[in-house]
From Swiss-Prot:
GO molecular function: S-adenosylmethionine:tRNA ribosyltransferase-isomerase activity
Intracellular or extracellular location(s): Cytoplasm
EC number: 2.4.99.17
Taxonomic lineage: Bacteria, Pseudomonadati, Pseudomonadota, Betaproteobacteria, Burkholderiales
Species whose genome carries this gene: Burkholderia ambifaria (strain ATCC BAA-244 / DSM 16087 / CCUG 44356 / LMG 19182 / AMMD)
Keyword Disulfide bond: no
Descriptive protein name: S-adenosylmethionine:tRNA ribosyltransferase-isomerase
GO terms for biological process, alphabetical: queuosine biosynthetic process; tRNA wobble guanine modification
Pathway annotation from the record: tRNA modification; tRNA-queuosine biosynthesis
Family to which this protein belongs: Belongs to the QueA family.
GO cellular component, one term: cytoplasm
Main localization, broad class: cytoplasm
InterPro entries (alphabetical): QueA, QueA_dom1, QueA_dom2, QueA_sf
Catalyzed reactions per annotation: 7-aminomethyl-7-carbaguanosine(34) in tRNA + S-adenosyl-L-methionine = epoxyqueuosine(34) in tRNA + adenine + L-methionine + 2 H(+)
Subunit structure and binding partners: Monomer.
Length: 355
């Protein structure tokens, strides 16, 4: 079996992108070409993406919108707290992480952003239920702060509020951006439309668990966080039409990939075709996984020892990803959320887990 150490690599800290580039499409794109063996690595700019895909292909985007989910506040006693909304569960309720010197008990009142009070409800490990006095999406948007990933060393500013959202974000609910989509601007989308590339969207609300480290050497023991997704019938129909004309299904980002593959795996297990799905998923994709829907993947460069690095290794092959990451480091690509992108093609046969 593969172990956690198989997905480690040394990354110079200066390659961790701290800010977005001035233009979304100014990022670089490392195309991994599987038509030759070993895979050929092609250095491109992201604006060249249309030349890498064909009319009739289908790009699948995640249209989730990042909430201003971070709050500072205090208890009635005056003790300071930090709150990160994990998920909106109802008009006036949400699950949240709370950092405090002492965990608040049920019924405790918390003052957030010196603007409104919430009441702590039942514990849903590792989260707390919070009850809001008004619709929580409204209060979150008005008074919250945009949460940036832990490896970005500055607090969110006005530029982040624009650039840490995709241009097509429409369904609020995430606490982290589907970052592969950050490279697309409206002119690029219009160019893809004009050349006959199809587009479709799904929704997966990215949770803070996306940054959760893997703490066990035997990765089979890792338990994934759960996220909610909505795969609409319109997307199911477009996938069928793409297959019929011989096109590729291209996931924009690992969140789109996880939603597509989760729905397809559930359909397989139920003995039925892919169908519209609204569900929770804790799908954990590692080498040996059999991909059912996605042919190609646009994705950023991921953290060492992360579940997302395991996912792309399962998709393109462990050695291919190792070679691509070595190349990216040598060529000074920018890493993580505000970094550069890769275009990967699915390995034809699943890679068996190591013995």
């Amino acid at each position: 079996m593969f172990t956690l150490s198989d997905f480690d690599f040394n990354l110079p800290p200066e390659l961790i992108a701290q800010t977005a580039l001035p233009e979304r499409t100014a990022s670089r794109l490392l195309e991994v070409d599987h038509t030759v063996e070993p895979a050929r690595l092609v250095d491109r700019n992201f604006v060249e993406l249309p030349s890498c895909i064909a009319p009739g292909d289908l790009l699948v985007f995640n249209d989730t919108r990042v909430l201003k989910a971070r709050f500072f506040g205090q208890k009635a006693s005056g003790g300071k707290i930090e709150v990160l909304i994990e998920r909106v569960t109802g008009t006036h309720t949400a699950l949240a992480q709370i950092r405090a010197s002492k965990s608040p008990g049920t019924g405790t009142t918390l003052r957030l952003a010196d603007a409104f009070d919430v009441t702590v409800g039942e514990r849903v490990e590792p989260f707390f239920t919070l009850h809001f006095p008004q619709p929580c999406l409204t209060l979150i948007e008005q008074h919250g702060r945009l949460p940036l990933p832990p490896y970005i060393e500055h607090d969110a500013d006005a530029n982040d509020e624009t650039r840490y959202q995709t241009v097509y974000a429409s369904n609020p609910g995430a606490v982290a951006a589907p970052t592969a989509g950050l490279h697309f601007d409206l002119p690029l989308l219009e160019q893809l439309d004009a050349m006959g590339v199809e587009r479709a969207t799904l929704t997966l609300h990215v949770g803070a668990g996306t940054f959760q480290p893997v703490r066990v050497e035997n990765i089979a023991e890792h338990r994934m966080h759960s996220e909610w997704y909505d795969l609409p019938q319109s997307l199911v129909d477009k996938i069928a039409a793409t297959r019929a004309r011989g096109g590729n299904v291209i996931a924009v980002g690992t969140t789109s990939m996880r939603a597509l593959e989760a729905a397809a795996r559930s359909a397989d297990e139920a003995g039925r075709p892919l169908a519209a799905t609204q569900a929770e998923t804790d799908i954990f994709i590692t080498p040996g996984y059999r991909f059912r829907v996605v042919d190609r993947l646009v994705t950023n460069f991921h953290l060492p020892k992360s579940t997302l690095l395991m996912l792309v290794s399962a998709f393109a092959g462990v050695e291919t990803i190792r070679a691509a990451y070595r190349h990216a480091i040598d060529e000074r690509y920018r890493f993580f959320s505000y970094g550069d992108a890769m275009l990967l093609t699915r390995r034809d046969t699943p890679e068996a887990p190591q013995a």
